[in-house]
Curated annotation (Swiss-Prot):
May participate in the coupling of lysosomes to microtubule plus-end-directed kinesin motor. This is BLOC-1-related complex subunit 8 homolog. It comes from Dictyostelium discoideum. It comes from the Eukaryota. One of its GO terms (cellular component) is BORC complex.
Length: 240
């Protein structure tokens, strides 16, 4: 018990000593602050100097604010520029790439065509084929010209029906002239017989002429057919 009482009394004594030391320090600091306030001179400023100091402080604060905000403003402008111009640049690059591919394709086509032309010029069969084609075209033109001439000549010549009709008209005129030249006489048997004979002869001559003209026309048609067949055969042989 005695030991416990001693320890409790010791602790109380230490706590009281601590409080007393803290109070002494606070008193010393307070007295020191009062002494410093008494030693400081009192500042007295004019209105003009106060305005100048206020303006300078505002300018300094605005300058500091501007300097602090410059990086953010610069980044904003950079981002805006990128946002506006990057899509355009991407489209231009795509177009350039597509045009480059097209140019490459065209260049390959040109290379292939020049190579094929060189090979064609080296091969002689193509030149032979072209010469044969030219010859066949010339012969076909000649045949067309010949046929056109034959067609024109056939149109210039009178047709068979017109020939027969004209010959019939001529014979009829001759017959009428013969009838008008005959003098009227008494009907006798001899005169009747002679008239009949003349009429029969005229009719026979007329028929013979018509037959001759028809034979000539048939011969001309046969000749034209033979010439056409020969021309067609020659053309087929040359083409083959």
């Amino acid at each position: 018990m005695s030991s416990i009482l001693k320890s409790s009394t010791g602790s109380n004594h230490s706590s009281t000593s601590n409080h007393s030391s803290i109070n002494n320090i606070s008193q010393l600091s307070g007295s020191h602050g009062v002494e410093q306030q008494q030693l400081r001179p009192v500042l007295t400023l004019d209105a003009s100097t106060a305005k100048l100091m206020y303006q300078t402080s505002q300018e300094m604060s605005s300058y500091i604010q501007q300097v602090a905000n410059e990086p953010t403003i610069g980044l904003f402008h950079v981002q805006d520029h990128i946002r506006r111009n990057i899509p355009k640049n991407v489209e231009l690059k795509k177009n350039i790439k597509a045009l480059g591919e097209k140019i490459e394709e065209k260049s390959f086509d040109i290379d292939y065509s020049t190579k094929t032309i060189k090979t064609f010029s080296e091969i002689q069969t193509f030149s032979n084929i072209s010469s044969l084609l030219q010859q066949s075209i010339e012969r076909a033109n000649k045949l067309v010209n010949n046929k056109s001439l034959l067609f024109v000549n056939s149109q210039m010549a009178a047709p068979s029906s017109s020939k027969t009709f004209s010959s019939f008209q001529q014979q009829h005129k001759i017959y009428q002239q013969q009838q008008t030249n005959l003098t009227p006489s008494k009907p006798t048997l001899s005169n009747d017989k002679t008239n009949d004979n003349n009429n029969n002869n005229n009719n026979l001559n007329f028929v013979e002429k018509i037959e001759k003209e028809e034979k000539i026309e048939k011969e001309d048609e046969g000749k034209e057919k033979d010439e056409k067949e020969k021309d067609d055969k020659d053309l087929n042989e040359k083409i083959n």
